[in-house]
């Protein structure tokens, strides 16, 4: 093998340095979702689709503070949703490029863009999949007295979701054949008290190993079940809003009450943790609900914020260096969940998207 040239050696060194500091190394190929974003701004996309309902204008108008790390709304293309503002936002090239409004009521909690461009989301009263042109291709309405806060695509033809209720149930539905392939009752703090329904669950994920990772928000634990719903792993934490199985085998958990994001291993040892107090004061957030682990090792934390007073998104490196703070209440509402669209992977392939 001939010796490396100086420019190539320098390039390799820069890539290694970028990886070491949790920054993006040059990608070998574009992320698949980036290639389809032009569909959302094509001439055939209506401002308000036939199934949409307009929302009350946002009440936050404070401009973004100057000098925040990163590139504001231009840092990443992303799908962005938040409790308290029923308008889903697709951000691309630093601006809102597409929206999906769902009227009054509660609440956006989970969102996925699929590799075919469709968007799967929960809206508490229902779970639905829409095209970039805002055509509804599938929808399931929660029965009276139940709620849906979490969903996940499994391939392009199946959807997993949890229905809070008495009892709560986990479903896997084939949206093409309409067949219910899985319907399983989940534990709950009460099977008779309607007041406990809302706080039962916010996040459940189907893993690359074919298991179900369930966050019991009110019961204070994250439980992993095998395909037959036998418990194979659990972790106690006061109010787990979300948990995602990482590609390294660890589990990334966000706790709403303690405002923390914690990575634990199979032995239940904490290997990484982030709290607002770990950050410089101007970058501190409150009301954290979900978090995303990017392919470069960075973590993006979502916050409902304080109506314009604190950041909505914060991205940190593994050593907790802040590389991006998004505080833009003039254009965006609270951040409950975000899907970073320039991250590699096929979202509907379990385990590819760590959000």
State where each predicted segment sits.
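Bacterial N-terminal signal peptides
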Residues: 7-20
């Amino acid at each position: 093998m001939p010796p490396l040239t100086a420019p190539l050696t320098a390039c390799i060194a820069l890539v290694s340095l970028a990886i070491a500091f949790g920054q993006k190394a040059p990608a070998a190929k574009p992320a698949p979702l980036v290639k389809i974003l032009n569909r959302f701004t094509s001439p055939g996309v209506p401002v308000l689709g036939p199934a949409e309902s307009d929302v009350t204008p946002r009440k936050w108008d404070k401009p973004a503070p100057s000098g925040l790390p990163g590139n504001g709304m231009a840092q990443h293309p992303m799908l962005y949703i938040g409790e308290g503002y029923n308008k889903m936002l697709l951000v691309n090239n630093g601006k809102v490029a597409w929206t999906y409004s769902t009227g009054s009521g509660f609440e956006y909690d989970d969102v996925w863009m699929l590799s075919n461009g469709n968007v799967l989301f929960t809206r508490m009263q229902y779970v639905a999949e829409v095209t970039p042109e805002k055509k509804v291709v599938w929808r399931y309405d929660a029965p009276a007295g139940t709620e849906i806060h979490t969903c996940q695509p499994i391939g392009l033809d199946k959807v997993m979701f949890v229905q809070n209720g008495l009892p709560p149930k986990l479903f896997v539905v084939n949206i093409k054949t309409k067949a219910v392939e899985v319907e399983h009752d989940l534990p709950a703090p009460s099977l008779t008290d309607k007041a406990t329904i809302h706080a039962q669950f916010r996040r459940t994920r189907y893993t690359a190993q074919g298991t179900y990772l369930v966050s019991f928000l009110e019961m204070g634990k994250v439980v992993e079940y095998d395909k037959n719903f036998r418990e194979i792993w659990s972790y106690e934490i006061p109010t787990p809003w979300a948990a995602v199985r990482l590609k390294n085998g660890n589990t990334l958990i966000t706790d709403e009450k303690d405002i923390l994001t914690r990575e634990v291993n199979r032995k239940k040892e904490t290997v990484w943790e982030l709290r607002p107090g770990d950050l410089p004061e101007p970058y501190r957030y409150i009301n954290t609900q979900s978090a995303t682990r990017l392919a470069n090792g960075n973590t993006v934390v979502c916050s409902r914020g304080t109506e314009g007073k604190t950041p909505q998104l914060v991205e940190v490196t593994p050593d907790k260096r802040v590389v991006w703070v998004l505080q833009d209440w003039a254009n965006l509402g609270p951040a409950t969940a975000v899907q970073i669209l320039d991250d590699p992977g096929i979202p509907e392939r379990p385990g590819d998207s760590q959000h």
